[in-house]
Amino acid sequence: MIAVGYDIVEFAPGKWNGEGKHKIIHIDQRPAHINMLYQPEVEVVGDISYSLQQILYRSDAKEEPEEFLKLREEMVAEYESYADDTSFPMKPQKILYDVRKFMGADDIVISDVGAHKMWIAREYNCYEPNTCIISNGFATMGIAVPGAVAAKLIYPEKKVLAISGDGGFMMNSQEYETALREGTPIVTLIFSDASYGLIKWKQMDHFGHNCFVDFQNPDFVKYAESMHAKGYRVEKAEDLLPILEDAFQQKVPCIIDCPVDYSENTKLSEYLHDKFEK
């Protein structure tokens, strides 16, 4: 097992090395954090890009394995298949396709924690370092808005988009007062489904039903206006791109309420189970 830039907090070794039988090569800029199931045979510590280049130069392999090329082709084809999807509420794949189309390579996305985070990790391609910040490890709900304010203070010339579920947004939405006071015209895109989507997803996967995860949302447009920000509501799939364009022209913080179809969560779980856990 070759682990590149791997942190045991993000994907516990027990999930892929439960019996401790894999030999591990650890490639990272820092020494490995050792535990019972993560004990590398070899550690390559240093700049990851340089280390991989040196390994490549010394490798006898001349072509990429066919199975990985095929997997990449499948993922690209799946990603592109949502380009013209007009279903509503919007699928998370389509939302992120449009977001990636709109955001520049150097612009910054700050992800909150929830079901949307799983989709961002799967669907949002990054072209430059530190342009997609995700709270893993402790997985802190409510990070997106204050994180976006901080990013905008540091990089005022860049577009900064906070992406959050409705649950995570309401945990720290009062920081929109801070955003306004500090003159940071961030934009928050809310994946709105009136529930704690990731917990519901896990409950459905494990138990086939869910409980105690649904709630009522405020009117996010009026909520924004009450804080002297600007609010938008996506009413159809074709709305999202022009709303993003308009929101980033504003001089005040903005909130975009975008209904999401999280029936895609269970479909993804079933697809991954069938493909990789046979």
Across the structure, where does each feature detected by a protein language model lie?
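Conserved thiamine diphosphate
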Residues: 43, 51, 57, 204-243
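Glycine-rich, acidic loop regions that bind phosphate or pyrophosphate groups
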Residues: 1-71
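Thiamine diphosphate
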Residues: 1-9, 118-196
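Short beta-alpha connecting loops at secondary-structure transitions
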Residues: 34-42, 130-134, 171, 200-212
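A short alpha/beta connector and helix-capping loop motif
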Residues: 39-52, 175-192, 270-271
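Glycine/aspartate-rich loop-and-adjacent alpha/beta segment that forms the canonical ThDP
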Residues: 12-17, 204-207, 237-278
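Active-site diphosphate/adenylate-binding microenvironment
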Residues: 73-151, 157
